[in-house]
């Protein structure tokens, strides 16, 4: 068996096109365009690249984009005051604080200061709680994007044994909630899991988000399983690789995401989708 590729780049491009069309319709109806504020603290190179991509995405779909590039020594109180101002700004539908933050800043406190209706990353405890109670509002972008990728395969998730490798607040935990909502029987593995191979090898669907290149061996993948690789790791030779041993896994899986070009583009597209949703359903 050779796996079919889940082309996140193409699916994300289609989603951006739909969002841009809706923004055009809003303009024609005399409605304001959605607004996204992006806060970057410090000069972390990877964060600067991610933020540049997000701003480019906003321009592509016609959003209002406000950039706040702040020095690394910005204080907690200064950031809280900025978030308060953006919470009160009617032109802004979404507020994004780029992670990671400098060590002196409390990320949890800052993210919780964002009004839940403007939490387009979907990290606020209120939005995670809504997802847990099967009433999602603004959903975490990466898990939401993965559900869109899974839908593109046409696979029926109901009753599938799904294994999530990694239990972070950003991907693993909300991913488990999304899969539960999708009808899967879900197992979450983490760094204390004793026999990772045993869990992965029985899974109909594997979502790997551990940040460790090649952690999941291709031979562990069950024949015909769906493999979603969230990991993106730069090797010494400059190559980007995922958390799954791709070449072997692709010979066993029915569907697999490439790295790069799989999950990453969908995360960005879902940030735009959340911002549009906030504008249309929470703020208009």
UniProtKB/Swiss-Prot annotation:
Which GO terms label this protein's molecular function in UniProt? methenyltetrahydrofolate cyclohydrolase activity; methylenetetrahydrofolate dehydrogenase (NADP+) activity
From the UniProt annotation, give the residues forming the signal peptide.
none
Biological processes, Gene Ontology terms: L-histidine biosynthetic process; methionine biosynthetic process; purine nucleotide biosynthetic process; tetrahydrofolate interconversion
Q: Does the keyword Amino-acid biosynthesis apply?
A: yes
What Pfam families does its record include?
THF_DHG_CYH (PF00763), THF_DHG_CYH_C (PF02882)
Its pathway is:
One-carbon metabolism; tetrahydrofolate interconversion
List the catalytic activities from the record: (6R)-5,10-methylene-5,6,7,8-tetrahydrofolate + NADP(+) = (6R)-5,10-methenyltetrahydrofolate + NADPH; (6R)-5,10-methenyltetrahydrofolate + H2O = (6R)-10-formyltetrahydrofolate + H(+)
The alphabetical list of record keywords is:
Amino-acid biosynthesis, Histidine biosynthesis, Hydrolase, Methionine biosynthesis, Multifunctional enzyme, NADP, One-carbon metabolism, Oxidoreductase, Purine biosynthesis
Chain sites annotated for binding NADP(+): 166-168, 232
Do the record's keywords include NADP?
A: yes
Q: Mind telling me which PANTHER family this protein's record contains? A: C-1-TETRAHYDROFOLATE SYNTHASE, CYTOPLASMIC (PTHR48099:SF5), C-1-TETRAHYDROFOLATE SYNTHASE, CYTOPLASMIC-RELATED (PTHR48099)
Q: What does this protein do?
A: Catalyzes the oxidation of 5,10-methylenetetrahydrofolate to 5,10-methenyltetrahydrofolate and then the hydrolysis of 5,10-methenyltetrahydrofolate to 10-formyltetrahydrofolate.
Which protein family is named in the record? Belongs to the tetrahydrofolate dehydrogenase/cyclohydrolase family.
Q: How does it assemble?
A: Homodimer.
**What's the name of the protein?**
Bifunctional protein FolD
């Amino acid at each position: 068996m050779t796996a079919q590729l889940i082309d996140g780049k193409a699916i994300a491009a289609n989603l951006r096109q739909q969002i841009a069309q809706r923004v055009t319709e809003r303009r024609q109806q005399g409605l304001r365009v959605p607004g996204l504020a992006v806060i970057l603290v410090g000069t972390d190179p990877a964060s600067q690249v991610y933020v540049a991509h997000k701003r480019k995405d906003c321009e592509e779909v016609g959003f209002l984009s406000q950039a706040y590039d702040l020095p690394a020594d910005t204080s907690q109180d200064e950031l809280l005051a900025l978030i308060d101002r953006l919470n009160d700004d009617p032109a802004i539908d979404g507020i994004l604080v780029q992670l990671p933050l400098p060590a002196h800043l409390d990320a949890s406190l800052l993210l919780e200061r964002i009004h839940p209706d403007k939490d387009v990353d979907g990290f606020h405890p209120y939005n995670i709680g809504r997802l847990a109670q099967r009433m999602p509002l603004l959903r975490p972008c990466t898990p939401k994007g993965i559900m869109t990728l899974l839908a593109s395969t046409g696979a029926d998730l109901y009753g599938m044994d799904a294994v999530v490798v990694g239990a972070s607040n950003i991907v693993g935990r909300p991913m488990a909630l999304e899969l539960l909502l999708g009808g899967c029987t879900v197992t979450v593995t983490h760094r204390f899991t004793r026999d990772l191979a045993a869990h992965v090898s029985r899974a109909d669907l594997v979502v790997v988000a551990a940040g460790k290149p090649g952690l999941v061996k291709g031979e562990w993948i069950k024949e015909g399983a769906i493999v979603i690789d969230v990991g993106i790791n730069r090797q010494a030779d400059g190559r980007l690789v995922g958390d799954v041993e791709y070449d072997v896994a692709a010979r066993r899986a029915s569907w697999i995401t490439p790295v790069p070009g799989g999950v990453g583009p969908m995360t960005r597209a879902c940030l735009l989708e959340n911002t549009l949703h906030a504008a249309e359903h929470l703020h208009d």
